[in-house]
């Protein structure tokens, strides 16, 4: 009887990578080129901190060789040892055959230049909010700033914190603030706790397990940040294998993608200070959000790579 071929999670036969001969790949850039070719051949999806196969390949190569991504150019033509080459080929093979996000394979992702631990208990963070903290919350009379000064922010809430990366970025950005971070997932909070500890912020970032505002009592905040589940039913059905490897809970926003967003907007007024505000990421659903909440004067904030995916609303406009 013929042996059954190994299957992927989606039921297809797992792709096989041709054996690489000794000496065929020599330098870091050789392994990047080889990776890109295999990634393109396998039609991988890129949406987890990198947006193209070249950046993904460079990220994997650097992590495997214990290099910061910023160091790749300096070592691009350096030779790779035999042991390092085997490690790299194993990683490339895993990325192609498992379709897991690269960040899961190396247990790391970078946001705003800072490293964060990730594994399959959390969605791989790729929020625009970190960039917006820098561009719209600088104060000091900066054009477009939504606050007077970062030091004036005393309490921040991060809803649906996942790995805790946004809570940590907020703690760095607002030096006088304490940060509460909430998630319903026990596993996610375990990952967040590791990240908070590794960044030395245990005294300033407090983790809470619960459903949105439920564990917070009557606490009020100067700023609420959230990147909640916002994928609609149609989008959930079309997720690529890389996204299906992540926790479904972190994506699923209900039929129209707004189940969690509605609850946040409904309850946020009870947890904001009079001069506070809410910043919320909703993906590419701006038109739907505007139609669902025509009475709200939402301010849509753009970044270098996004347009109309994050909104701001002041506490006074939510009452």
From Swiss-Prot:
GO terms for cellular component: cytosol. InterPro entries: DNA_methylase_N6_adenine_CS, HemK-like, Ribosome_uL3_MTase, SAM-dependent_MTases_sf, Small_mtfrase_dom. Coiled coil: none annotated. Methylates large ribosomal subunit protein uL3 on a specific glutamine residue. Keywords: Methyltransferase, S-adenosyl-L-methionine, Transferase. Its EC number is 2.1.1.298. Pfam families: MTS. It comes from Bradyrhizobium diazoefficiens (strain JCM 10833 / BCRC 13528 / IAM 13628 / NBRC 14792 / USDA 110). It catalyses: L-glutaminyl-[ribosomal protein uL3] + S-adenosyl-L-methionine = N(5)-methyl-L-glutaminyl-[ribosomal protein uL3] + S-adenosyl-L-homocysteine + H(+). Gene3D superfamilies: DNA helicase RuvA subunit, C-terminal domain, Vaccinia Virus protein VP39. It comes from the Bacteria. One of its GO terms (molecular function) is protein-glutamine N-methyltransferase activity. This is Ribosomal protein uL3 glutamine methyltransferase. Signal peptide: none annotated. It is an enzyme of class 2 (transferase). The keyword DNA damage does not apply.
């Amino acid at each position: 009887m013929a042996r059954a071929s190994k299957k992927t999670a989606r039921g297809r036969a797992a792709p096989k990578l041709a054996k690489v001969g000794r000496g065929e790949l020599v330098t870091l850039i050789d392994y990047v080129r080889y990776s890109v070719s295999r990634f393109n051949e396998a039609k991988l999806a890129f949406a987890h901190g990198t947006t193209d196969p070249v950046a993904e390949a460079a990220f994997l190569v650097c992590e495997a060789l214990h290099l910061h991504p910023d160091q790749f150019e300096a070592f691009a033509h350096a030779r790779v040892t035999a042991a390092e080459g085997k490690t790299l080929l194993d990683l490339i093979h895993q990325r192609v055959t498992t379709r897991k996000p690269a960040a899961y394979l190396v247990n790391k992702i970078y946001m705003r230049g800072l490293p964060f631990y990730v594994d399959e208990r959390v969605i791989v963070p790729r929020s625009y909010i970190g960039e917006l903290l820098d561009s719209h919350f600088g104060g000091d009379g900066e054009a477009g700033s939504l606050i007077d000064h970062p030091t004036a922010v005393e309490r921040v809430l991060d809803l649906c914190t996942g790995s805790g990366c946004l809570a940590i970025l907020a703690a760095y950005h607002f030096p006088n603030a304490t940060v509460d971070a909430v998630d319903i997932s026990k596993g996610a909070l375990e990952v967040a706790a590791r990240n908070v500890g590794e960044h030395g912020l245990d005294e300033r970032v407090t983790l809470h397990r619960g459903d949105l505002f439920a564990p917070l009592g009557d606490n009020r905040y100067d700023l609420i940040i959230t990147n909640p589940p916002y994928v609609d039913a149609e989008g959930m059905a079309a997720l690529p294998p890389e996204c299906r490897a992540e926790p479904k809970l972190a994506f699923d926003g209900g039929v129209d993608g707004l189940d969690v967003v509605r609850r946040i907007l409904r309850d946020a007024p009870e947890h904001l200070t009079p001069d506070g505000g809410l910043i919320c990421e909703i993906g590419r659903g701006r038109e739907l959000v505007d139609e669902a909440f025509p009475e709200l004067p939402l301010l849509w904030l753009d970044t270098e790579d996004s347009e109309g995916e994050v909104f701001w609303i002041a506490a006074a406009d939510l009452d």
